[in-house]
C-alpha cells in the first residue's frame, strides 16, 4: 500500500510485470502508476462488515485501509423447530418509483454471513432461481468454509459455494430451499446515463432485512483496479448509495429488473462521495451460468497483445481502436487471419476504441463463441470471423 500522503491511504501500488496469460492484456504505455487521484476503491464486503479485532492481508488487498474494529457479534441462538411458513401471494405493484421497485425486489435479496477467525463477515446476494441458486461477489465468499444465507422472511440457511470467479468478482451459492422468489433479470446493455437506479443490499450487517437506496446511472464502462493484479472491466457507476456489506446486492432499473451486481465503492478524505460500482448483469449472468453448469468459467481468449491506437485530428489525439502488437500461435486471432499491426475497431458491431473496451466485450463472451471483428489493415477494412478460444 502506498504512503498515506495528504489524502489518506490509497490502494494503487506500482504495477508489476504481468505474468498471467489468461487475458488479452494491454501493453503498458508508460511506467506511471495506475491510480485515481485521492480515491480508494473499496470492495464492499469485508471492508466494513468484519466484526472482529483485525483485518487480514486479503482484506487489505481489497480495501486498502484499516477499519476500526467493533466488538464481535454474539453467536446465533440455538436452532428452533418452526412450523412450515404460510405462503403469501406475490406483491403486485406498478413500475414507476422506488417504493414499488423495493416491494418487488426485497423478497429476492439475501444477507450472506461468512464466519472467520476475526469475527463475522457479511455481504449480500440475489436469488437467481427458485431452487436455491444465489448470485453474490467472489470477494464475499473467497476462502469461506461455512456460509449462511439469511432471507428477507427471516429464514437462515446453510449455503454451498458452487463456484467463484475472481476475474469478474462473481460467485454462486446454493441453499436447499425450493420456494424462493427469483429476481427478474433485466439487461445492462440498454441502460442510459441519468436513468433511475435502485440499490438493494444488507449494509453493515444491520438486522431488519434489506436496505434500499435510490439514485441514477452515472456512467458506463468504468474500469477499476481493485487490488494489484485484479482489474474489473465494464462496471456501471451509480450514485445510489452502496454501503459496505452491500457487496453482492442488486442494482435495479425502474421496473425492478436486475441490471447489475453491486461490488465496490470509492471513498475519499476530501469530501466527494456518491461513487458506487456494479458488475453489469449481461456479464454476470454468463459467468453465473458457467459456474452453475460446471463450477468453472469459460472465459474467452482472443490470443493477442495490444494497446490503444490513437489518430490525429485537428491537432488532437483521439483513441480509434486497439493496435495488435503480438499474436499468439496458435490462437483464435491467428486462425481467423489476424496479423500484427491490425487495428481492431469493432466487435459484432460494437465500437472498440480502447483496450479497455475490447476487454469489456471479451468478459461478456464465452469460449467457443463466434464473433466478427472489424479491422483496419494498411488503410483497408477487413472483417474477421473469429471463434474465441479458451483460457
PLM ranges: what are they?
Residues 319-323:
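Charged active-site motifs of nucleotide-sugar-dependent glycosyltransferases
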Residues 188, 250, 314-318, 331-343, ...:
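A short glycine-leucine-enriched loop at secondary-structure breakpoints
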Amino acid at each position: 500500500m502506498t504512503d498515506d500522503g495528504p489524502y489518506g491511504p490509497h490502494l494503487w501500488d506500482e504495477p508489476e510485470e504481468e505474468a498471467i496469460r489468461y487475458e488479452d492484456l494491454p501493453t503498458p504505455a508508460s511506467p506511471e502508476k495506475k491510480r485515481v487521484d485521492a480515491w480508494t476503491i473499496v470492495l464492499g464486503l469485508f471492508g466494513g462488515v468484519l466484526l472482529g479485532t483485525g483485518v487480514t492481508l486479503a482484506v487489505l488487498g481489497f480495501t486498502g485501509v484499516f477499519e476500526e474494529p467493533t466488538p464481535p457479534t454474539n453467536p446465533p441462538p440455538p436452532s428452533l423447530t418452526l412450523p412450515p411458513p404460510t405462503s403469501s401471494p406475490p406483491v403486485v405493484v406498478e413500475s414507476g418509483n422506488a417504493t414499488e421497485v423495493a416491494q418487488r425486489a426485497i423478497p429476492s435479496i439475501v444477507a450472506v454471513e461468512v464466519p472467520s477467525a476475526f469475527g463475522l463477515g457479511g455481504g449480500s446476494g440475489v436469488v437467481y432461481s427458485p431452487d436455491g441458486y444465489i448470485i453474490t461477489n467472489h470477494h464475499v465468499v473467497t476462502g469461506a468454509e461455512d456460509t449462511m444465507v439469511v432471507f428477507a422472511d427471516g429464514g437462515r440457511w446453510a449455503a454451498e459455494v458452487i463456484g467463484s470467479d475472481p476475474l469478474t468478482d462473481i460467485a454462486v451459492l446454493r441453499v436447499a430451499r425450493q420456494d424462493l422468489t427469483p429476481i427478474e433479470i433485466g439487461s445492462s446493455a440498454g441502460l442510459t446515463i441519468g436513468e433511475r437506479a435502485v440499490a438493494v443490499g444488507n449494509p453493515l450487517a444491520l438486522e431488519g432485512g434489506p436496505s434500499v437506496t435510490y439514485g441514477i446511472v452515472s456512467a458506463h464502462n468504468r474500469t477499476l483496479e481493485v487490488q494489484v493484479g485484479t482489474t474489473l472491466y465494464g462496471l456501471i457507476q451509480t450514485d445510489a448509495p452502496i454501503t459496505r456489506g452491500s457487496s453482492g446486492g442488486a442494482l435495479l432499473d425502474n421496473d425492478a429488473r436486475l441490471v447489475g451486481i453491486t461490488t465496490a465503492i470509492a471513498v475519499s478524505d476530501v469530501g466527494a462521495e456518491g461513487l458506487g460500482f456494479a458488475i453489469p448483469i449481461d456479464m454476470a449472468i454468463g459467468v453465473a451460468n458457467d459456474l452453475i453448469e460446471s463450477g468453472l468459467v469459460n472465459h474467452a481468449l482472443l490470443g493477442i497483445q495490444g494497446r490503444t491506437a490513437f489518430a490525429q485530428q485537428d491537432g488532437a489525439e483521439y483513441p480509434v481502436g486497439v493496435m495488435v502488437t503480438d499474436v499468439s500461435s496458435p490462437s483464435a486471432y491467428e486462425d481467423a487471419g489476424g496479423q500484427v499491426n491490425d487495428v481492431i475497431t469493432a466487435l459484432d458491431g460494437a465500437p472498440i476504441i480502447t483496450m479497455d473496451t475490447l476487454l469489456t466485450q471479451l468478459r461478456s463472451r464465452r469460449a467457443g463463441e463466434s464473433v466478427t471483428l472489424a479491422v483496419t489493415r494498411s488503410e483497408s477494412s477487413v472483417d474477421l470471423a473469429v471463434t474465441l478460444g479458451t483460457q
